Amino acid sequence: MSGELKRGLEGVLVAESKLSFIDGDAGQLVYCGYDIEDLARDASYEEVLYLLWHGALPTGEELDAFSDELAAHRDLDDGVLDVARELAEQDESPMAALRTLVSAMSAYDESADFEDVTDREVNLEKAKRITAKMPSVLAAYARFRRGDDYVEPDESLNHAANFLYMLNGEEPNEVLAETFDMALVLHADHGLNASTFSAMVTSSTLSDLYSAVTSAIGTLSGSLHGGANANVMRMLKDVDDSDMDPTEWVKDALDRGERVAGFGHRVYNVKDPRAKILGAKSEALGEAAGDMKWYEMSVAIEEYIGEEKGLAPNVDFYSASTYYQMGIPIDLYTPIFAVSRAGGWIAHVLEQYEDNRLIRPRARYTGEKDLDFTPVDER
């Protein structure tokens, strides 16, 4: 076997997609032809889901019908709730719990074992159920582990507001609901990242949609992919607890050889466009609360890292302070990433099914050859 070895598959083209376009030099992200700044400002998460799954923005009538269908699928079967309670009692990590619960959801989906896993209409219905129920299982698990009861979904609320309602037991105000909806839009898709590629590899074997999403959640749980926003917030809290100037704290961390979370990206060579939008939201939340500490600390660190390391923040950097100011527990940040990205994972799986080919790369063998076998009693 010959050819250039591409570790990490960096820069390797393995598929064609109409879903998202990234210009790493210009700092641009596009979903199905629409710039992320426009979508974050004007579109709901439901509109973005429809766009990713159908390739076009919905009409008002289509959006109403689509949103109603999603809302109708939010409630959970008793068996799934029982699993969530058990995981909470065992103090399972949120990402492991979400992975297990999504897999458990398939046991209560009559179409989960539908013979033709590539049937688009069946998969679209399945996609609605998965996407509608993922926020519900996460909220249920989070409430169970703190000793609270399950809050049934409210079909009058949109996708974002309903999650916050099911998590906290009270309807969020307009600012929090709109901020969370925008965060879901920003995280909905991002090309062939590791978790998306994992979902595509799984679906390329003609495994089902639940298996693909479960694979993606497992991949996102790794520290090199998901989890950076939680690490950013833990860092900000450490800085706050130290009473040090943020730049001095970061300088000391760098001198110790530590990595500062939330900076740099495999694709962007400039500031992540999503970080720009979330930074503005973090600032607005701070102003509304009369407490600019977390935003100002983040800005100071961004400026220092930019000057000293030439690195720009990615989406995780400002999502940390945004979520924290919304009162979301830190260890739910990555599961929320999964709740949002499920729409993109599913969109890529639908594309994969439309023109499927088993994904089967090769490795360059570097081991021994022509060894003589020695029986076990002679070794």
Curated annotation (Swiss-Prot):
Belongs to the citrate synthase family. Its EC number is 2.3.3.16. Pfam families: Citrate_synt. It comes from the Archaea. It comes from Haloferax volcanii (strain ATCC 29605 / DSM 3757 / JCM 8879 / NBRC 14742 / NCIMB 2012 / VKM B-1768 / DS2). Might regulate the synthesis and function of enzymes involved in later enzymatic steps of Krebs cycle. Gene3D superfamilies: Citrate Synthase, domain 1 (1.10.580.10), Cytochrome P450-Terp, domain 2 (1.10.230.10). When expressed in E.coli, CitZ is produced in a soluble but inactive form that can be reactivated by incubating with 2 M KCl. Citrate synthase is found in nearly all cells capable of oxidative metabolism. Pathway: Carbohydrate metabolism; tricarboxylic acid cycle; isocitrate from oxaloacetate: step 1/2. This is Citrate synthase. Keywords: Acyltransferase, Allosteric enzyme, Transferase, Tricarboxylic acid cycle. Homodimer. InterPro entries: 2-MeCitrate/Citrate_synth_II, Cit_synth_Halo_CitZ, Citrate_synth-like_lrg_a-sub, Citrate_synth-like_sm_a-sub, Citrate_synthase, Citrate_synthase_bac-typ, Citrate_synthase_sf. The gene is citZ. The active site is at 225, 265, 316. It catalyses: oxaloacetate + acetyl-CoA + H2O = citrate + CoA + H(+). One of its GO terms (cellular component) is cytosol.
